[in-house]
C-alpha cells in the first residue's frame, strides 16, 4: 500500500 514502504 502506497505511499507506505511496507506495502507487503
From Swiss-Prot:
GO MF, any single term: alpha-amylase activity
Reactions accelerated catalytically: Endohydrolysis of (1->4)-alpha-D-glucosidic linkages in polysaccharides containing three or more (1->4)-alpha-linked D-glucose units
Domain of life from the UniProt record: Eukaryota
Record's keyword annotation contains Transmembrane helix: no
Record flagged with keyword Calcium: yes
Class of enzymatic activity (EC top level): hydrolase
Cofactor note: Binds 3 Ca(2+) ions per subunit.
Needed co-factor(s): Ca(2+)
Catalytic activity, EC: 3.2.1.1
Keywords: Calcium, Carbohydrate metabolism, Glycosidase, Hydrolase, Metal-binding
Quaternary state and interactors: Monomer.
Family designation: Belongs to the glycosyl hydrolase 13 family.
Protein name in the entry: Alpha-amylase 2
